[in-house]
Each structure stands twice: as structure tokens, then as C-alpha cells.
Amino acid sequence: MSDVEFKKHRVFRETQDVIFYDISVEDSNASDLVVHEGSAVSPPDDSVGAKQFYIHYHQVDHNRVLKGERTFELVNVEWKYPYHIVHLNRSSGALIIPRGTWHRSTSGENGSIVINQAIRDDLFNHCLLYTSDAADE
């Protein structure tokens, strides 16, 4: 799994029932909070039940689970092993999803909360981010 990378957090301090984390991502210029209720799938399957995926050409994702569990499917034909299933929880660090990587995620049965500390370039267009036109980004 050498193609899959994580940005690990740094623990500043631990006290009873409290942990302080540094979750900085260098050059991040956007933060998205993604909340799944229950075992949600994003993007959802299409009308005939086929899987759908997101792909970004002007954004690198850094998806970090804040609460719950999330499983990502990643497809990148430039990797030695193009298909990966990656399970994340709070201790995993941020999953780095490079430009040009098809991806989708499924939450555990109790849902999940993820922060994506993205790095977006000047050609990023939020209007195309989550539509069927995203492949034309």
C-alpha cells in the first residue's frame, strides 16, 4: 500500500479524558466538514445501483476522521496497485487523496464526522465539485 499516504497528527498534550492534537496541514487553504448520519455512502449509488465516485483535478484532499469510522475506496490508475480500501478512525491521521484519484466513502453504522483540510489550486471551481460535471473540472 505504498501509494496510500497519511498526514499524521501530533499530540501536544494528554490529560485524563482530554487529548490536544496539532492537525495542521501545510498549504491547506480550505476546510470542509462532512457529517454522515448512520452508514451513509458518498457519493450515493446511482439509480441502477452502480457505484459513483468523486474525482478532483484541482484539489488534494486530506480527510481526517473526527468521530466514528469511515471507509474510503480509492482508484488511481497511476499507482502500482490502483485500487485500495482504506479504513479510518480518529487515530489514523488524515488520508491524502491526490488529484486525479477516484474516491468514495462509507461511514460505520453510527455515522462519522470528517474534516477535509484541502489544498486547492487557482483553477478550483466549487460549482463543479459535486456534480456529474466534476470530471470536466
Question: Predicted regions span which residues?
Answer:
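Short beta-strand His + acidic residue motifs that chelate non-heme Fe in jelly-roll/DSBH
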Residues: F72-E73, H103-G108, N116
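A short, N-terminal "cap"/entry segment at the start of jelly-roll beta-barrel domains
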Residues: M1-F53
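Short, conserved beta-strand element in jelly-roll/cupin
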Residues: Y57-F72
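Tight coil/turn sites that cap or link beta-strands
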Residues: G38-P44, S91-S92, P98-G100
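Short acidic (Asp/Glu) patches
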Residues: D46-Q52, H56-Y57, W79-P82, R99
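A short hydrophobic beta-strand segment most commonly corresponding to one strand
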Residues: N110-L128
